[in-house]
């Protein structure tokens, strides 16, 4: 209403108003408003230098306030606000206090601070705060619009995070890239389910209630499920699948057998799914397993200049014959790994690209924004078009040959080759590649054929030891093989040489690509850190991010770990 303002870059840091304002220009910022209450007591001599106290076991926090305490907490049954949108006018007003709702926190707080039962209450304040579906704030350049930056959704810790977040966002705006790996708060971690405000609200209320609860290893969200399901969801569920969720997708984590509890029981020790994952792991090494990996993010890059565009973006060579599979990283200007994926040359002017489920928005944005100006190449998302069944293990070839008339022998279908084959009348792109370190194929096929192909594979393979397997077995298998995972082991702060992936960089060619100068500079100067894999002799449960000490001095950290 104040007219138009032209600017080169725009930053939206509008708190709970950010979502609605961004939506007016087609940008999705997944946050919602939740009522948050805290109490201010009368003065009872609290020292002004009292440190802030948090008691996660009792879901509460406390800080000094003019000789008294300001205290509150995060109840498990948070109250959403502004379900129909933030009313106008509303300028940081307070909401009506809800004493009955706050009573549950009072009961938790009294054993920790008994004095609260004796002192008077000045106020119970209730105000709306913006919260996000995963409890992390939102930073970065919006994937929908170039030069539009977001800083919002601070989950009631904006003051604590403000200095660091402000510095990071300022450098991101000034330099066009974040100063370091900010994936946990990157706006591109969100995807299609986050377009639905009701879904976001459901998940956000769960995250609000877990603000102070125990963060268990491998803990899954419970709300907003099931959302995205592969065609095999019901079949796998009836076979004992225990599902996890990634970007809205239901994915089989492990399979319970008769007599086993088909749900996760969280612990810092050996979890209840350990034996099930061990069975699946053993089958992959000795017979064969079938994974439903339909949730893979999948793109097609096509156009007369597709090869030229991908040669610039990818660190590995992609000027290879049709049918060749290329494993590659995509680097930033510092040589850091922004994407870790595979691409298949399906035609002279077309590539089929697959990447991890959780990186669908991030990787699509990275590829599309780095197609050089003036080149005729288009990137489209085909994730929902294709199902993916991954057949891995020593008996994989025997099983696959039983269900197709196409020759899948090593001589006809070697590693690194993708071929069109037919299974039960289904046109299938059979990609000879593996993330578990065994013989196998990723079978990419139209979703309507998934159930048919699954049935025929299981019927043919069961006598040879084929069994269902889930994502937790994929994790243990790839760890055993030493395969890297983006956002855990590698990322924007790690170069290919540091990650042990220098062999996948086309430095022996004269082809220009993004990040080449940084890789060359590091090779000339030498690396100062490197990724290593190792085992421990003792039966110790590790989850990742533990510190590594050598001779009493910190020398590194665990990026991933398994048992």
Regions from the language model: what does each represent?
Residues 2-9, 13:
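Core beta-strand elements of the Rossmann-like FAD/NAD(P) dinucleotide-binding domain
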Residues 23, 39-80, 97-100, 111:
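Mid-domain catalytic core of redox enzymes
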Residues 25-48, 104, 297-300, 387, ...:
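Central beta-strand plus flanking loop segment that forms part of the substrate or channel wall
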Residues 304-337, 394-426:
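Internal amphipathic helical hairpin motif
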